[in-house]
């Protein structure tokens, strides 16, 4: 024990029993703070305590005697050291921090496609649902009109908690107005991204939040959004942002203009970005032909978020899904190439501390030679370097097997194996490996997905194995 730099106590053993006890010396009556160092296994730990000296009686100078319990009175032990009470020193109140709790990869979408509503957004209310992955007290949104040919007019925007999945009903007791620079009616300029004001909105991790927006003018083509939401979006005519529920509504499974949502969360909250293609985007989780439905929240990232929340030490880590179906690292289909959107989808969020890269299968479609290896490698290296320059730990996920798919060729498989071999080596510079590959591969034919995880007409997407993938993640990497 020390008082400042002065050693005032020592641990000695009783002669008869061999049990240790503390001897306190030179402590005056009143309150003071002691610092202790002790061994816990092989580690040296520190403990700071506040002590209260109840009496100023001095110990017999010739002998070191044991400290009595805090219930002993000085009169009962006149020759003992003063009785003390040990209480922990109060810790400072943690400072909340902003962390992105939900996000999606923005892409250029056509309003006339099957993935989008068949009526214009103008003069309609669109209720979009997101699942937050952290707990917080305040919320704010980034709204994007990156690809739009004209401004987006927001006449009114409200948020509330969804009552149950696959239903437009909201809990009106939680209804709150979203503003931008204090205004309820605002513009998202063409080609721009804006951040709304922070508003009070207490919410728990894994709750569903409905964002209801009454639109004025909007682009009719090149809408900024995300096609594969895997969650239901509801649309009705007129201003119904605070309506308890909707009738005569249209449905889609896309998001519009929403880039991310951030929460003011507990100190130490962090985010992990999952960067990739349709496998990360959750292809198949809402496919009716596979017997699946929207709003199941069964992408591998969804299972990962649930595991993080249930695990002590990672409960304040959020998951941001930055996957886009059909996207590749090199090619700009159906939107910006992965290499071109990486910085945006990684660095524009709050509190990102980790990144998982599972990307590249769409670059390997029926290759006629192995030249793609030399084109892809520098792009992986740039992504890894970007993470490290921004103090973000990056975990590589080797490309999954696709031997039974239409993408397969001998050269495609050669490039896949070369990339995976490099990624697993120290040369890649990744901070760890997330081994989805071996989690879903067929042990007897490792160039294929295990048959039970995919469809015989697919062979690329392990939509029945997304939970297996999430279970393969070592949560210690995110402590």
Residue ranges and their predicted role:
Residues 275-277, 397, 434:
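Active-site flanking residues adjacent to catalytic metal/cofactor-binding acidic residues
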Residues 1-66, 70-72, 86:
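Extracytoplasmic soluble-region selector
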Residues 365, 400-479:
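Catalytic His-Asp segment of secreted/periplasmic serine-dependent ester chemistry enzymes
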Residues 151, 157-163, 237-241, 245-254, ...:
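Conserved SGNH/GDSL esterase-like catalytic core that processes O-acyl groups on lipids
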Residues 55-275, 280-288, 292:
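N-terminal secretory targeting modules
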Residues 380-388:
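Surface-exposed amphipathic alpha-helices with a cationic face
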């Amino acid at each position: 024990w020390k008082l400042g730099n002065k050693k005032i106590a020592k641990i000695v053993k009783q002669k008869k029993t061999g049990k240790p006890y503390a001897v306190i010396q030179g402590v005056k009556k009143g309150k003071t703070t002691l610092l202790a160092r002790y061994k816990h296994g092989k580690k040296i730990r520190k403990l700071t305590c506040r002590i209260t000296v109840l009496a100023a009686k001095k110990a017999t100078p010739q002998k070191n005697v044991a400290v009595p319990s805090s219930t002993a009175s000085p009169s009962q032990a006149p020759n003992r050291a003063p009785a003390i009470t040990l209480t922990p020193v109060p810790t400072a109140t943690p400072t909340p921090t902003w962390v992105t709790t939900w996000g999606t990869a923005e892409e250029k979408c056509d309003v006339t496609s099957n993935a989008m509503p068949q009526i214009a957004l103008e003069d309609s209310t669109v209720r979009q649902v997101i699942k937050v992955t952290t707990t917080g007290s305040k919320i704010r949104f980034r709204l994007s009109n990156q690809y739009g040919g004209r401004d987006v007019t927001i006449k009114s925007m409200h948020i509330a908690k969804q009552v149950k999945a696959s239903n437009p009903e909201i809990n009106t007791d939680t209804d709150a107005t979203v503003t931008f620079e204090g205004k309820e009616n605002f513009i998202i300029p063409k080609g721009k991204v804006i951040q709304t004001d922070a508003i009070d909105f207490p919410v728990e991790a894994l709750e569903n939040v409905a964002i209801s927006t009454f639109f004025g003018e909007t682009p009719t083509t090149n809408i900024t959004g995300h096609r594969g939401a895997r969650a239901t979006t509801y649309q009705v005519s007129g201003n119904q942002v605070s309506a308890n529920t909707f009738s005569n509504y249209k449905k889609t499974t896309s998001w519009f203009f929403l880039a991310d949502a951030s929460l003011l969360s507990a100190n130490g909250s962090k985010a992990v970005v999952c960067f990739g293609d349709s496998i990360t985007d959750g292809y198949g989780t809402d496919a009716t032909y596979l017997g699946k439905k929207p709003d199941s929240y069964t992408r591998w990232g969804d299972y990962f978020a649930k595991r993080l929340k249930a695990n002590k030490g990672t409960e304040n880590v959020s998951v941001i899904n930055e996957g886009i179906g059909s996207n590749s690292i090199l090619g700009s289909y159906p939107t910006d190439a992965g290499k071109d959107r990486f910085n945006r989808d990684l660095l524009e969020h709050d509190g990102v501390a980790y990144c998982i890269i599972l990307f590249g299968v769409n670059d390997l479609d029926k290759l006629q030679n192995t030249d793609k290896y030399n084109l892809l490698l520098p792009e992986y290296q740039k992504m890894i370097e970007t993470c490290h320059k921004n103090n973000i730990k990056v975990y590589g996920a080797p490309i999954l097997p696709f031997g039974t798919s239409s993408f397969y060729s001998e050269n495609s498989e050669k490039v896949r194996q070369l990339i995976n071999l490099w990624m697993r080596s120290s040369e890649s510079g990744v901070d760890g490996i997330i081994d989805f590959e071996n989690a879903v591969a067929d042990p007897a034919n490792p160039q294929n997905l295990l048959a039970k995880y995919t469809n015989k007409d697919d062979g690329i997407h392990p939509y029945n194995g997304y939970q297996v993938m999430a279970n393969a993640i070592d949560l210690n990497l995110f402590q």
